Amino acid sequence: CGKSYEEEEEEEDDELEADVAQNLSSKRSARQLDADMENEVLNLARSVSPAAKRLALEHTAEPALAAQSAAAATPPVGLSLPPTAPLGFGPEDMQQALQLQLHSYIEMVRQLAPDAFPNPNLATQFLLQNSLQALAQFQALQQLKQQRDQQLPTASEQLPTRHYSTPLSKSPLRSPSLSPVARSMEPQQAQRTPPNSLAAAGLGLSSAVLTPNTPSMQQQQQQTMTSTTNASSTPKPLASGATVAAVMATKLEQSPEETTDLEELEQFAKTFKQRRIKLGFTQGDVGLAMGKLYGNDFSQTTISRFEALNLSFKNMCKLKPLLQKWLEDADSSVAKSAGGVFNINTMTTNLSSTPESILGRRRKKRTSIETTIRGALEQAFVLNCKPTSEEINQLSERLHMDKEVVRVWFCNRRQKEKRINPSLDLDSPTGTPLSSHAFGYPPQALNMSNGGHVLLEAGGSHCGSSISSGE
């Protein structure tokens, strides 16, 4: 207490200066320790431990040995394997990465827990060893993955060659679609040996069972191929296994005259059809006229097939001269008629004198009936669907029509009614009158006045289409 105020202040200043000096010295010593620790860590990073070196050498040696063994085991395919791609990790890059990791780890340890790790050198050494081991394992895994990727395409290239290792002689009854035959021979076999041609070529049952894989069938195919390729202008006898299709193909190749005959037949059939229609003859008339003229009766179906080119080549060749002669006779008869126009009367009056008149009869024209006459016929049909011969004569005289036309109209009308109403009995010999409602006429529409004449009132329905008179 005997000290003055100024002395107390001086003592406090001296104590503060002493504290500051101690703090500065402690900080300097701490900095020196930090620098020494960093140098030790860097030296550890540069000098790798022998255990880590041994592990890295083992991992690098194993992929090299595996690559050598794989190269020795796999045969050369013609394509050299690509070299191993570099991993992109040099020694300098590895050291820099490790140094950065160590610095960051040391700073993190000092900031978070300065008292937890009294000796940070051991922690940094442990971290360095772990990082080196992880890096070596990563490199080994990358090399193994690259080797597997390189071995996959080589294995896929070798797989297709295994399909052709089985011999063909062990399976004589194998179907052609399932047999592993070369693709280049398939179009030739498809052209020369169709499946249905074995029986047609005259082969037995034992040879018909054979497939293209058997030796005997292959010999027959070789014989057919050599015979077709060495064919000259004169046809040679083919082997027993030659098919009908191959024979026809060789004939068409050897005789170009047949192709011209086919073209001529096609053109003649077209011309014949046009001339026949222009002259007014039907296909049935042509067949009948040819029977009368030349003694060969032909049906309408035969003439139709000739015009449509649906007959065989031989039948077409046999039929062509007869039709050509008939066409010439028809043209000459047209030229002899008055004014050069076709006249059916000139061909029907002299049937016994001139051969041109026996060409056949012409089809009658379609008979057209007026609406009023058709209405009267419908009314008569309602009253009696099957009139007698006398009733037909009276009706034809009253309507000023031909008796044959009226008779044919009633026949056609009965057939039409059968199609419309199948339950009605129109074949009764008495010809009973039918109800007017069955034909769509009301009872008021029928008027039986005017001396027995059948008339149709204005309210009756009419059919405006023409009725064809049959023959």
Curated annotation (Swiss-Prot):
Principal location: nucleus
InterPro entries for this protein: HD, Homeobox_CS, Homeodomain-like_sf, Lambda_DNA-bd_dom_sf, POU, POU_dom, POU_domain_TF
GO CC, any one term: nucleus
Assigned keywords, A-Z: Activator, Developmental protein, DNA-binding, Homeobox, Nucleus, Transcription, Transcription regulation
Occurrences of domain POU-specific (ranges): 257-331
Polar residues biased stretches: 186-196
GO molecular function, one term: RNA polymerase II cis-regulatory region sequence-specific DNA binding
Protein name: POU domain protein 2
Organism: Drosophila virilis (Fruit fly)
